[in-house]
C-alpha cells in the first residue's frame, strides 16, 4: 500500500507508520495450561490440553474477524491485554457496583498465563513470533460481560 499522494508530490516514508491491531475475544478469559505428558509403550509424549487448543483457536478467529488485513506487525511490539471477568450473579446490587468500580479480579487464572494464551495464539498470524513483544501490560478486572480486549502496536523510535 502506498501513502504517497498524487496531488502532493512530497515523498512519504512508509517505515514511519506505526501499525497496530485491536480486537476482543468474547467469553471468560482463559490462562494457558501446562502441556500434559503421557507414557505409552515406554515412550513419553507431550500434548497441549484440549481446552487450551480451543481457546487459542477462538483467539485466532476473533483476531481474523476484527482485523481486516493480512499485515504482520514487525520489529518490537507493545501488547496490552485487558481480561474482563463477569461479576457473579449471586452478589447484591450494591456489591456488584463496588466490584465494577473499585476492585480488580484477583482470582485465577494468573495474568502471565492469560498473556501466554493470547500471545501464543497470535504467532505467525499477527507477528512472526511472540518474542517480538517487548512491552506487556495485563490487567484483570470485573465487568458486565466476560471478554478479553487485546491491543497490539509496533514500537517505533524516531
Each predicted region: which residue ranges?
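Acidic, proline/glycine-enriched N-terminal capping motif
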Residues: 2-158
Amino acid at each position: 500500500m502506498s501513502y504517497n499522494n498524487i496531488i502532493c508530490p512530497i515523498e512519504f516514508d512508509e517505515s514511519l507508520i506505526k501499525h497496530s491491531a485491536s480486537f476482543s475475544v468474547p467469553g471468560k478469559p482463559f490462562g494457558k495450561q501446562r502441556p500434559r505428558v503421557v507414557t505409552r509403550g515406554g515412550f513419553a509424549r507431550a500434548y497441549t490440553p484440549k481446552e487450551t487448543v480451543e481457546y487459542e483457536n477462538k483467539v485466532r478467529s476473533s483476531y481474523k474477524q476484527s482485523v481486516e488485513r493480512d499485515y504482520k506487525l514487525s520489529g518490537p511490539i507493545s501488547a496490552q491485554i485487558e481480561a474482563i471477568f463477569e461479576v457473579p450473579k449471586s452478589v447484591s446490587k450494591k456489591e456488584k457496583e463496588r466490584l465494577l468500580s473499585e476492585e480488580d479480579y484477583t482470582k485465577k487464572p494468573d495474568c502471565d498465563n492469560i498473556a501466554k494464551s493470547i500471545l501464543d495464539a497470535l504467532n505467525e498470524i499477527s507477528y512472526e513470533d511472540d518474542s517480538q513483544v517487548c512491552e506487556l501490560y495485563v490487567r484483570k478486572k470485573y465487568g458486565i460481560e466476560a471478554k478479553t480486549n487485546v491491543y497490539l502496536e509496533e514500537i517505533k523510535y524516531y
